[in-house]
Amino acid sequence: MMQISSNGITRLKREEGERLKAYSDSRGIPTIGVGHTGKVDGNSVASGMTITAEKSSELLKEDLQWVEDAISSLVRVPLNQNQYDALCSLIFNIGKSAFAGSTVLRQLNLKNYQAAADAFLLWKKAGKDPDILLPRRRRERALFLS
């Protein structure tokens, strides 16, 4: 089974941001590392909590398990490592159910790799900003096509 590469992890950290000190996310949820909201060594994320970069990477690998499971269960065509890494970044951001109903997945499973790549650009809206994620999607699309 494929897994995200170290290059994919580095890119995902750059896209999502990594914070080694706990903070409240845009919805007020205590968060640490790369968007981690679960427990850290059995403790809930709380104000003042800090972690090492190594712990952040460990948490991210655990948090990516559902993403990798989504790819394994939904994608029915061969992928190269860059395509896999780009999909990990997209799915980590939009969620499994959104990906499951996406044009990206539909085109991919038809072996229309170019159309699948172009469909990344449809996932550009967040909150009230219709284009805020477009630069990220362009980078993911470029990785997918490389």
Swiss-Prot record:
Belongs to the glycosyl hydrolase 24 family. Gene3D superfamilies: 1.10.530.40. It catalyses: Hydrolysis of (1->4)-beta-linkages between N-acetylmuramic acid and N-acetyl-D-glucosamine residues in a peptidoglycan and between N-acetyl-D-glucosamine residues in chitodextrins. The keyword Hydrolase applies. InterPro entries: Bacteriophage_GH24, Endolysin_autolysin, Endolysin_T4_type, Glyco_hydro_24, Lysozyme-like_dom_sf, Lysozyme_dom_sf. Its main location: host cell. It is found in: Host cytoplasm. Keywords: Antimicrobial, Bacteriolytic enzyme, Cytolysis, Glycosidase, Host cell lysis by virus, Host cytoplasm, Hydrolase, Viral release from host cell. This is Endolysin. The keyword Aminoacyl-tRNA synthetase does not apply. GO terms for cellular component: host cell cytoplasm. It is an enzyme of class 3 (hydrolase). The active site is at residues 16, 25. The gene is 19. It comes from Salmonella phage P22. HAMAP family: ENDOLYSIN_T4 (MF_04110). It comes from the Viruses. PANTHER family: LYSOZYME RRRD-RELATED, PTHR38107. GO terms for biological process: cell wall macromolecule catabolic process; defense response to bacterium; peptidoglycan catabolic process; viral release from host cell by cytolysis. Endolysin with lysozyme activity that degrades host peptidoglycans and participates with the holin and spanin proteins in the sequential events which lead to the programmed host cell lysis releasing the mature viral particles. Once the holin has permeabilized the host cell membrane, the endolysin can reach the periplasm and break down the peptidoglycan layer. Its EC number is 3.2.1.17. One of its GO terms (molecular function) is lysozyme activity. It holds the Pfam family Phage_lysozyme.
